[in-house]
């Protein structure tokens, strides 16, 4: 809710708190000494996590996990593709170069089924890269497995959006009028509340 201070004078009512959940995928890993908290009991945040200090009591930082379904399991090479495809679902993806992809519903979408019930968009799939590949990306695996980490169900990958303008318009409409958007903000205590109505 970083935008609350900028908009706090616009609203006089307290909105119902909305539960939010975020998943961050870092395909090439983390510098673990700058990522992991130093003491699990007190959750002394690392340099990387320190901007989230005000949420410390609401955080869970997991470590030591492994994704066995990302292993070859007889499919041969394709580790990068399988790592992306299995990250949030634990399902070994179907080895295919065609449209008959199959993985599994991801944890973010299971959560969105519950947390997104009272919001216009149950989930947002965002990316910072434009690397949308096509064809055979990794030893017999379709590129769709590398292009998305969220799956609505076993056969429906959810594309990620990396254009901030498109995301903004999806959330708040295509109105170019600042007055129209400001009118919408007056109904809520923060920009994030506008997407949870």
Language model: regions and residue ranges:
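Ligand-binding pockets and gating/stacking loops
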Residues: 1-197
């Amino acid at each position: 809710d970083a935008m609350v201070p900028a908009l706090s004078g616009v609203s006089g009512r307290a909105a119902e708190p909305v539960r939010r959940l975020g998943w961050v995928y870092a395909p090439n890993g983390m510098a673990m000494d700058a990522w992991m908290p130093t003491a699990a009991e007190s959750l002394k945040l690392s340099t990387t996590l320190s901007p989230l200090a005000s949420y410390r009591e609401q955080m869970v930082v997991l470590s030591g996990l492994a994704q066995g379904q990302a292993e070859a399991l007889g499919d041969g090479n394709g580790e990068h593709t399988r790592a992306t495809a299995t990250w949030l679902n634990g399902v070994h993806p179907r080895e295919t170069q065609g449209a008959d992809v199959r993985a599994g519903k991801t944890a973010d979408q299971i959560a969105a089924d519950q947390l997104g019930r009272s919001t216009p968009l149950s989930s947002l799939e965002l990316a910072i890269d434009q690397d949308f590949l096509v064809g055979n990306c990794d030893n017999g695996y379709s590129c769709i497995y590398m292009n998305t980490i969220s799956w609505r169900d076993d056969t429906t990958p959810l594309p990620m959006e990396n254009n901030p303008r498109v995301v903004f318009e999806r959330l708040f409409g295509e109105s170019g009028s600042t007055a129209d958007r400001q009118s919408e903000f007056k109904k809520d205590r923060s920009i994030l509340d506008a997407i949870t109505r």
